A protein has these predicted regions:
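AMP-forming adenylation/ATP pyrophosphatase catalytic core
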Residues: 1-13, 31-37, 69, 89, ...
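Conserved phosphate/pyrophosphate-binding and hydrolysis machinery centered on Walker-type P-loop NTPases
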Residues: 113, 117, 174-183, 201-205, ...
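Inter-helical turn/loop segments and adjacent helix faces that build the functional surface
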Residues: 192-204
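Core alpha/beta nucleotide-donor-binding catalytic domains of modification enzymes
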Residues: 1-188
């Protein structure tokens, strides 16, 4: 009964993923559908990509839906970068496609064509910007509704698969540019690591990400158990007992509490959790303002966290 919505751009990674899913569909009982997003950015090249994907899907007899967006216009309207706007519209496209499938949410999977080097690039990018454990294991083979069927494959293996199966694909010219940070990591930094440090750097980083993911999952579970003791009046009241927990559990619990109250994760950072922890050492009556209309205040017995 499951439906797999495959995000296909027409590039080498997504074409290998689509071919693998098409082959698996013969053995496993699921419905395969393709989602292609036209971002309205690259003019005739984007039109070419759309036609290519539509033609392949007709040839392989896979239903395909194209969603068109004016990303430059939306980027100006939303006051966001085009990269962030692109992520938002792609997420919306999958949501729109899922809505017309007539299935329960639990029966729908979204397949993304991230590969082993993508994972390594993301780790490096997040590490250089500053991150916690979560930012070092953001790409997982299966993560809720998201699946990444080719995360275990290197770009060399993907190239071999394309050649062996005689699968055509297209090249996105923006991937060749060094304008974006991720492309500079891809073209220069990761190859240098593999040439001058370890030839299997990307593979080893993928293995490390898997171990970090296990640690992240355990810490999240433990902090969730701790957090449940301090829920009160549509917020949280952290007494002395909370502040005797290991500090990493305190941080993870505060992270979950604030995400729950805010209803989102974006713009919540380590500095906010640290401020709440510091508040416990301050005098009664002190308070701090937090994103999304949240507030933490110190009273006689602890720290209260709630929405204003």
């Amino acid at each position: 009964n499951e439906v797999v919505l495959a995000g296909v751009s027409g590039g080498s990674d997504s074409m290998v993923m689509l071919h693998i899913l098409k082959e698996l569909q013969v053995k496993l009982d699921f419905t395969l559908r393709v989602v292609h997003v036209h971002h309205g950015i690259r003019g005739k090249e984007a039109d070419r990509d759309q036609s290519f994907v539509e033609n392949i899907c007709r040839k392989w007899q896979i239903p395909c839906t194209v969603y068109c967006y004016d990303v430059p216009g939306l980027s100006r309207e939303w006051k966001l970068g085009e990269e962030e706007t692109g992520r938002i519209v792609r997420k919306e496209a999958f949501q729109r496609e899922a809505a017309v499938c007539g299935r329960k949410d639990s029966e729908i999977k979204i397949a993304l064509a991230h590969n082993q080097e993508d994972l390594a690039e993301t780790m490096l990018h997040n590490l250089c910007r500053g991150t916690g454990l979560r930012g070092l294991c953001t790409m997982r083979p299966a993560d809720g509704e998201i699946i990444r069927p080719i995360l275990c494959l290197s770009r060399d293996k993907i190239a071999e698969y394309l050649k062996e199966k005689k699968i055509s694909h297209i090249q996105d010219s923006t991937n060749l540019s060094d304008e974006y940070t991720r492309n500079r990591i891809r073209h220069h930094i990761l190859p240098m690591l593999e040439q001058q440090v370890n030839g299997k750097a990307a593979a080893h980083m993928a293995e490390t990400a898997a171990r970090i993911s296990q640690a992240e999952e355990y810490l999240t579970q433990q902090s969730c158990l701790v957090l449940s003791e301090f829920q009160k009046d549509k917020g949280y009241y952290f007494t002395e007992k909370f502040f005797t927990e290991p500090q990493i559990i305190q941080v993870y619990a505060l992270q979950q509490a604030m995400e729950q109250l805010a209803g989102r994760r974006k713009d919540l950072a380590a500095v906010h959790y640290e401020k709440v922890l510091e508040l416990y050492e301050m005098q009664t009556g002190r308070r701090i303002s937090l994103p999304y209309h949240m507030e933490a205040r110190r009273d006689y017995e602890g720290v209260r966290l709630c929405r204003c």
